[in-house]
From Swiss-Prot:
Disruption phenotype: Worms exhibit increased resistance to aldicarb indicative of an affect on neurotransmission but equal sensitivity to levamisole which specifically inhibits the postsynapse. Mutants also show mislocalized rab-3 and snb-1 proteins. It is found in: Endoplasmic reticulum membrane. It is a multi-pass membrane protein. Residues 13-34, 102-136 form a coiled coil. A zinc finger (C4-type) spans 236-261. This is Endoplasmic reticulum junction formation protein lunapark-1. The lineage of its organism: Eukaryota, Metazoa, Ecdysozoa, Nematoda, Chromadorea. GO terms for cellular component: endoplasmic reticulum membrane; endoplasmic reticulum tubular network; membrane; neuron projection; neuronal cell body; synaptic vesicle.
Length: 342
């Protein structure tokens, strides 16, 4: 009969009850974890005290050969008791934490259903007050849990988001159809922006991949000095953003552009100038850069130095002079031949 005459509770009172139960369950989880650590600490300390008393008693009572056997037995027994007690204590507290986390998940799901019910049934002002009260609490708890540094949105954006939540389809259609008026200043600013700033306006730096290093990797890093602990970070001088890492030998000679602000950070030192060397010669006088070697060059020069067949006056005069010289050289040879014959 009580169910027939019972009045339905309002969503606001139900949300308050669920929020209180969620806070209670979170506090209970914290107390369970702290009590787990405290119990293990007191358990270990009590075993150490009992073991030290037992070792002193055996040292004073038993003789030399029996003393060592009893001490070894006590040590083995203490190790077994420690492991068994630790297993039992951790199992008990893990069961308690699983039970409370199950209740917490049920309470959170109930809270989300109640918030959806508030959005559907209540008026705009009442629903907005309830959502601002309970959704803010949920957002703050998630931020504290994840240790994130996110900025809260402005009140104007929050009001527009809440109004869009309760808007009808016709209102949403009108909102889409009416374009936002952009002034000339915004157009000029977008034109004056460089492509780098247009590309990196909403850029988020990539989180580095953290690999799990084994003992062998740590030994190699210690001897080779090639791990992340042996590198220098590239920090921007303007916005102090991390832009990667480099080896200590390359660090003074590296210039880089910042990922966040686009500032060009020059190198601290100028690198050593490497002298230009001539590429080595390959087979058949061909160099590695595709040029022709000295053997073919000399061949071409010899071909260019062949006697010319031009019939110019200078060439004919040179030819006549050469002919007269050859005749003068031939005359004494004939005279010598005649004298020898006679």
């Amino acid at each position: 009969m009580g169910n027939l005459f019972s009045r339905n509770k309002s969503p606001a009172t139900e949300l308050e009850r669920v929020a209180l139960s969620i806070d209670d369950l979170k506090k209970r989880l914290q107390t369970i974890s702290s009590s787990n650590t405290n119990t293990l600490y007191y358990y270990y300390m009590s075993i150490v005290v009992i073991l030290s008393i037992a070792m002193a008693h055996t040292w004073l009572r038993f003789e030399d050969p029996q003393k060592t056997y009893v001490a070894c037995a006590l040590m083995l027994g203490a190790i077994g008791i420690v492991l068994a007690g630790r297993y039992v204590i951790n199992g008990f507290f893990s069961w308690r934490t699983n039970r409370t986390t199950q209740k917490l998940e049920n309470a959170i799901s109930q809270k989300t259903t109640l918030l959806d019910l508030v959005k559907e049934t209540l008026k705009f002002k009442e629903a907005k007050e309830i959502l601002d009260r309970y959704e803010k609490i949920e957002q703050n708890t998630t931020i504290d849990k994840n240790d994130s540094t996110l900025k809260s949105p402005s009140p104007i954006k929050k009001l527009t988001a809440d109004s869009s939540m309760f808007a009808t389809p016709k209102q949403e259609q009108k909102r889409v159809e009416t374009p936002t008026a952009q002034g000339p200043n915004s157009a000029m600013n977008s034109m004056n922006m460089t492509p780098y700033h247009q590309r990196n306006r909403n850029a988020v730096p990539i989180r580095p991949f953290l690999r799990q290093t084994t003992a062998f990797d740590r030994v190699l890093d210690y001897f080779m000095s090639d791990g992340p602990n042996c590198r220098n970070a590239l920090i921007c001088s303007i916005c102090h953003t991390h832009n990667g890492m480099s080896t200590p030998a390359e660090y003074p000679y590296i210039s880089f552009r910042c990922f966040e602000c686009g500032h060009l950070n020059p190198a601290k030192k100028m690198g050593p100038q490497i002298p230009l060397t001539r590429p080595p010669m390959g087979p058949k006088g061909i160099q590695h850069n595709g040029r022709v070697g000295p053997s073919e060059n000399t061949h071409n020069m010899m071909e260019n130095q062949k006697p010319s067949t031009d019939l110019t006056p200078s060439a004919s005069q040179n030819g006549s002079e050469k002919g007269s010289d050859s005749e003068n050289e031939k005359v004494p040879e004939s005279k010598t031949m005649e004298t020898e014959f006679h």
